[in-house]
Regions:
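Short, glycine-/small-residue-rich phosphate/pyrophosphate-handling segment
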Residues: 99, 113-162
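N-terminal beta1-alpha1-beta2 submodule of the flavodoxin-like/Rossmannoid cofactor-binding fold
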Residues: 1-111, 159-202
Length: 202
């Protein structure tokens, strides 16, 4: 039986376009491609820098999306609407996600009402400056944002490997973190697997 082609979107939540977070998100996407998925990488720092109104002010209820209409953020949400899976990545900022990534998710009020991310499969990737540098609390923050949008969350495990943990956690420089790279490879298999298994409910 021919496998369905899944569409996986990576969100680099770092303000650095070519940094540690981008490297690991790209690694996951690269591995997803090996398992037959189509992929796209979006740099949230650039996208949010284009916003005239940087942060959600809850200016309307329900949200009309007026603050990002005609911008790259609107295009980003349209891309996410088409996705089967989403890889969310962020460096650790005081034990949580970057301001850019948080600001983007704060602006998902309209797409949340319309259930654009409902039953899409999410995976978290975080990079810290030290071994116990807030990576898991950063992943938890990502999980909260994904759960509130009705997403299905997977960790970094796979049946042929192990159950994994919260997601991909790395210590910078990520290019030298062999365990994080290994977890990225494993998590890609899991992400594509669950995307395929849940395709009928999206």
């Amino acid at each position: 039986m021919e496998l369905m082609v899944m569409y996986i979107v990576g969100l680099n939540g770092s303000p650095n376009k070519h940094g540690n977070t981008s490297f690991l998100v790209e690694k996951v996407l690269e591995e997803c491609s090996k398992h037959g998925a189509q992929t796209t990488l979006l740099h949230i720092g650039e996208i949010m820098n284009d916003q005239k109104i940087s942060y959600c002010t809850a200016c309307s209820n329900p949200c009309s999306g007026a603050c990002y209409k005609g911008t790259r953020l609107e295009e980003t949400f349209e891309t996410l609407k088409k996705a089967d899976g989403i890889v969310v990545g962020s460096p650790v900022y005081f034990g949580s996600v970057s301001a850019q990534l948080k600001a983007m998710f704060d602006k998902t009020r309209r797409i949340r009402v319309n259930k654009w991310l409902y039953n899409k499969v999410g995976l978290g990737v975080s990079v810290g400056a030290s071994k116990f540098g807030g990576q898991e609390t950063t992943l938890k923050a990502m999980h909260d944002m994904m759960l509130v949008n009705g997403m299905i969350i997977v960790g970094d495990g796979f049946i042929d490997d192990d159950c994994g943990h919260h997601g991909v956690c790395a210590v910078r420089p990520a290019t030298e973190d062999e365990n994080a790279i290994k977890r990225a490879v494993i998590s890609a298999k899991r992400l594509v697997e669950v995307c395929r298994a849940t395709q009928s409910i999206r």
